[in-house]
């Protein structure tokens, strides 16, 4: 596994409705030399109903999202936060990266470590 000195760990929460994926939260933490140095976290406004499963899994409610910024604003802020830094995530290659790509952000070259894959390989 590549050793990263300065990187972004990120996670997305999303809701599926009528075949479309809707972001509901974008979170990221910047680490340098193993220390958290900055963080970004935003809910995302949506008018689509939240599935009860998503509410139970995340604790996010429609009330939480009603005054949140629009997805375009959140995506821009996230892009500014990440910059060109390497990224790590948990199973993000299968879910989070494709969702970001739907919003015009291609982080496939910056995505360096998938912690799900690392954990699976170490158990084998």
Predicted regions span which residues?
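Conserved non-catalytic scaffold segment of RNase H-like nuclease domains
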Residues: 2-105, 109
């Amino acid at each position: 596994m590549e050793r990263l000195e300065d990187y972004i760990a990120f996670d997305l929460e999303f809701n599926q409705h009528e075949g479309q994926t809707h972001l509901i939260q974008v979170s990221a933490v910047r680490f340098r030399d193993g220390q958290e140095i900055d963080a970004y976290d935003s809910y995302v406004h949506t008018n689509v109903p939240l599935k009860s499963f998503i509410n139970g899994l995340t604790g996010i409610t429609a009330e939480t999202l009603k005054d949140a910024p629009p997805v375009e604003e959140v995506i821009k802020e996230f892009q500014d936060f990440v910059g060109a830094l390497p990224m790590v995530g948990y199973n993000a290659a299968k879910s989070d990266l494709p969702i970001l790509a739907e919003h015009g952000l291609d982080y496939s070259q910056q995505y360096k470590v998938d912690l799900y894959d690392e954990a699976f390989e170490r158990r084998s």
